[in-house]
């Protein structure tokens, strides 16, 4: 997201600022995930040294070149999928994991946080989409990016154990 923000032109400064703010949110999210992982017995070393599965590699291979393009507004489609998924499913997943694995709230804090806070992330996205900067061409690219990211997210799960 920070890479994408650095490629948004000054004419779209409010969008650039939103991307930068969102990058900070996502950085804190990763720290929360790391804490949860350690709380269930994992280590930061494992996170740093375990290779990505092929679905994660595919997602990164798609996202980073997109973020490096001028005014990568199509990545709003990725945000729509990612934030929408968290908004709709994270609470259910937190409760299911707690029940099935007998976990404490502090071991699923990332999922619990998103159950309560992805509405604000999603609202920011909605504001951008309603701002008037999204032309027909941009809208088409946003939709295509959303479809690709949704498929690559599914691929990450399908390839969970395939490094």
Would you name each region that the model predicts?
Residues 1-163:
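Non-heme di-metal
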